Amino acid sequence: MPPTPEVGLPLWLLAELTYRCPLQCPYCSNPLDFAAQGQELSTEQWFKVMAEAREMGAAQIGFSGGEPLVRQDLAQLIAEARRLGYYTNLITSGIGLTEARIADFKKAGLDHIQISFQASDEQVNNLLAGSKKAFAQKLEMARAVKAHGYPMVLNFVTHRHNIDKIDRIIELCIALEADFVELATCQFYGWAHLNRLGLLPTRAQLERAERITNEYRDKLKAEGNPCKLIFVTPDYYEERPKACMNGWGNLFLTITPDGTALPCHGARQLPVQFPNVRDHDLHHIWYESFGFNRFRGYEWMREPCRSCDEKEKDFGGCRCQAFMLTGDASNADPVCAKSTDHGIILKAREEAETAQLAIEQMTFRNDRNSRVIARG
């Protein structure tokens, strides 16, 4: 067994400001029972979190949700993050964004805005978002972000209902003069895991989409267009797991709306007691808490991970995925072909070939559905 690696610094702080959101995306990574979570942190409590994380080495902060724009103190939080020396990111649907708020955020020192789209087609986008005005608002705000001097960074979550239109998605991004485009195939956590049958593309769909993306990359390069296309494949079509979050509690720190501290944004579902910033400072949470030490190093590993010569590269894969698919977070990530549970992934691929679940049949992420799930 190699020596336990030194604990890294929490360089990347994800501030999940709220679970409130005007949209109802069926692939949202928020917890299914978000409606039953506790009271949101106050402005002053977030200031304390940001200051403590910065003292520990955090360099970049992402403001997300839910929809972070519903927080009326967002400009204050951005300004304080800037004062502390963070590189600041706003991760938003664009719903609730206005020219005036963009100007306020610019004045507060915001460095980066990423706007998410559900599809290139207005009808599909609005259906997935649960809002008839979502698409038009997103287009308007994407242009406004660019007009205020920000790079245009767009995120399209792709899945079986929109991935066959990847060419239209890319054409829309080119028309908008986007600088960076993330074509991120759905990752199956939270609501996406619940709706997997309606979201997981087939292998043929993925291969076609990646081929078309590569063709557009070549075309953009030949034309001297600086637009960068980033294509992200789902774990379910890999044979080896990802080094999730660069290792458990090693780089990435999430603070949820109620102050729960997590080593990744999906960890809340695990049967692990995670600390809260209302009760402990971040130094204690990061270095001493049980939750953040639970899957550090290699001692927790079972076979085949324990004796695997790749464990220092992938850390056994994703603990949340292992828990969701096998019921035990200490098991190998079933994505790995060496896992005795890899058949779960193979079965999911097979089911994707014949799945018939329509968009309208999926369970949408909203308060009503969340309350039903929370009641069990």
From Swiss-Prot:
Its EC number is 1.21.98.4. It is an enzyme of class 1 (oxidoreductase). Gene3D superfamilies: Aldolase class I. [4Fe-4S] cluster binds at C21, C25, C28. Keywords: 4Fe-4S, Iron, Iron-sulfur, Metal-binding, Oxidoreductase, PQQ biosynthesis, S-adenosyl-L-methionine. This is PqqA peptide cyclase. Catalyzes the cross-linking of a glutamate residue and a tyrosine residue in the PqqA protein as part of the biosynthesis of pyrroloquinoline quinone (PQQ). NCBIfam families: PQQ_syn_pqqE (TIGR02109), rSAM_more_4Fe4S (TIGR04085). InterPro entries: 4Fe4S-binding_SPASM_dom, Aldolase_TIM, Elp3/MiaA/NifB-like_rSAM, MoaA_NifB_PqqE_Fe-S-bd_CS, PQQ_synth_PqqE_bac, PqqE-like, Radical_SAM_PqqE_MftC-like, rSAM. Binds 1 [4Fe-4S] cluster. The cluster is coordinated with 3 cysteines and an exchangeable S-adenosyl-L-methionine. Its cofactor is [4Fe-4S] cluster. The keyword Lyase does not apply. Interacts with PqqD. The interaction is necessary for activity of PqqE. Pathway: Cofactor biosynthesis; pyrroloquinoline quinone biosynthesis. HAMAP family: PqqE. It comes from the Bacteria. Belongs to the radical SAM superfamily. PqqE family.
